[in-house]
UniProtKB/Swiss-Prot annotation:
Induction: By heat shock. It comes from the Bacteria. It comes from Bacillus subtilis (strain 168). GO terms for biological process: cell division; protein catabolic process; proteolysis involved in protein catabolic process. This is ATP-dependent Clp protease ATP-binding subunit ClpX. The keyword rRNA-binding does not apply. Zn(2+) binds at residues 13, 16, 35, 38. It holds the Pfam family AAA_2. ATP binds at residues 117-124.
């Protein structure tokens, strides 16, 4: 089992072949030996490779303007929110590159709060940022979280989702992005601290404080509740960027009251009342979030506040057609695979946008509307090889009329034949 030099009967390094007399130290393993020189060489190789990986990962963080330009390819509108996010994300990863200290000045982490109506693009913005930076990304729902000791999800399970997104590479996960949705749903029900514990509100905010600020958290590998004698994954949250989003329904009334109070004399209330909801959201301050029900410590962990506008008909039509992965482009590609050209008339796009506004679902509801319109088309057309083009009209959207189908010779299929 031992490796001997046959001539002198000495032990030798299994890697370089030097004898124990030719090296300073020989470390024994199960049936093998390695000398101090080979150990030093291996250490240098490993450190060099790991160092190179680290440099490649965050050496070329896009500049804020570049980040916004890429966001423009996937997300329509919300220019002010994009600008705020681009600066915050750039500063965050610049801080990581500098190891959090520059000339003994410690750089604090700036997590982000996104405030905007349902379907305005909060989740999509966060997802796109993670894609731009090529970092792990996880989405969590704040409504499912409870503080320790109550039935529900522990806040550490948020971190488990990020670790899973990084294929259990903890070091990679420690530089990822977590988007916590519906954060407004864990607001305290009143401005005054409650004597009894608020399981779904203040308690969750308290539980989130540590991981938002930066701590070494113990995460159960299989999720669920912690229990004794269980192994944990240790993860440092110092460099994880947290983006918390919510609709914050009713906060515009709080902002309106604050603006009204600051105007002295006649017309004070009118000035605040005339402001549209989107304008009010753009004027949100930390004190408004405090009155809404977030605790001061929690607001302090989210120093960057970005507000999103409600999407109008024009913006929703643009969302349907302009982004790289726009829904209309996706459905066109689906029918193209069946050798059928798909066309949406302008009136059809406008009616789809109007339906989304009526349902108050914003951009989030666009896919379900189009899926409903396209169901019969996608069911029937794969079985037909005589159709060249399918045209979705305004009447198709509003009254459920069949789309116009054109044959390869240019003639239009009658509606009777289509429904047959």
């Amino acid at each position: 089992m031992f490796k001997f030099n046959e001539e002198k009967g000495q032990l030798k390094c299994s890697f370089c072949g030097k004898t124990q007399d030719q090296v300073r130290k020989l470390v024994a393993g199960p049936g093998v030996y390695i000398c101090d020189e080979c150990i030093e060489l291996c250490t240098e190789i490993v450190e060099e490779e790991l160092g190179t990986e680290e440099e490649v990962e965050f050496k070329d963080v896009p500049k804020p303007q570049e980040i916004r330009e890429i966001l423009n390819e996937y997300v329509i509108g919300q220019d002010q929110a994009k600008k705020s996010l681009a600066v915050a994300v750039y500063n965050h990863y610049k801080r990581i590159n500098s190891n959090s200290k520059v000339d003994d000045v410690e750089l604090s982490k700036s997590n982000i709060s996104l405030i905007g109506p349902t379907g305005s693009g909060k989740t999509l913005l966060a997802q796109t940022l993670a894609r731009i930076l090529n970092v792990p990304f996880a989405i969590a729902d704040a409504t499912s979280l409870t503080e320790a000791g109550y039935v529900g999800e522990d806040v550490e399970n948020i971190l488990l989702k990020l670790i899973q997104a990084a294929d259990y590479d903890v070091e990679k996960a420690e530089k990822g992005i977590i988007y916590i949705d519906e954060i407004d749903k864990v607001a305290r029900k009143s401005e005054n601290p409650s004597i009894t514990r608020d399981v779904s509100g203040e308690g969750v905010q308290q539980a989130l404080l540590k991981i938002l600020e930066g701590t070494v958290a113990s995460v159960p590998p299989q999720g669920g509740r912690k229990h004794p004698h269980q192994e944990f994954i240790q993860i440092d949250t110092t460099n994880i960027l947290f983006i918390c989003g919510g609709a914050f329904d009713g906060i515009e009334q709080i902002i309106k009251r604050r603006l009204g109070q600051k105007v002295i004399g006649f017309g004070a209330d009118n000035k605040a009342a005339d402001l549209e909801k989107e304008d009010l959201l753009s004027k949100v301050l930390p004190e408004d979030l405090l009155r809404f029900g977030l605790i001061p410590e929690f607001i302090g962990r989210l120093p960057v506040i970005a507000s999103l506008e409600k999407l109008d008909e024009e913006a929703l039509v643009a969302i349907l057609t302009k982004p790289k992965n726009a829904l209309v482009k996706q459905f066109k590609k689906m029918l193209e695979l069946d050798n059928v050209e798909l066309e949406f008339e302008e009136e059809a796009l406008s009616e789809i946008a109007k339906k989304a506004i009526e349902r108050k679902t914003g951009a989030r509801g666009l896919r379900s509307i189009i899926e409903g319109i396209m169901l019969d088309v996608m069911f029937e057309l794969p079985s037909r090889d005589d159709i060249e083009k399918c045209v979705i009209t305004g009447a198709t959207v509003t009254h459920g009329e069949p789309p116009r189908l054109l044959l390869k010779d240019g003639t239009e299929v009658s509606q009777d034949k289509t429904s047959a």
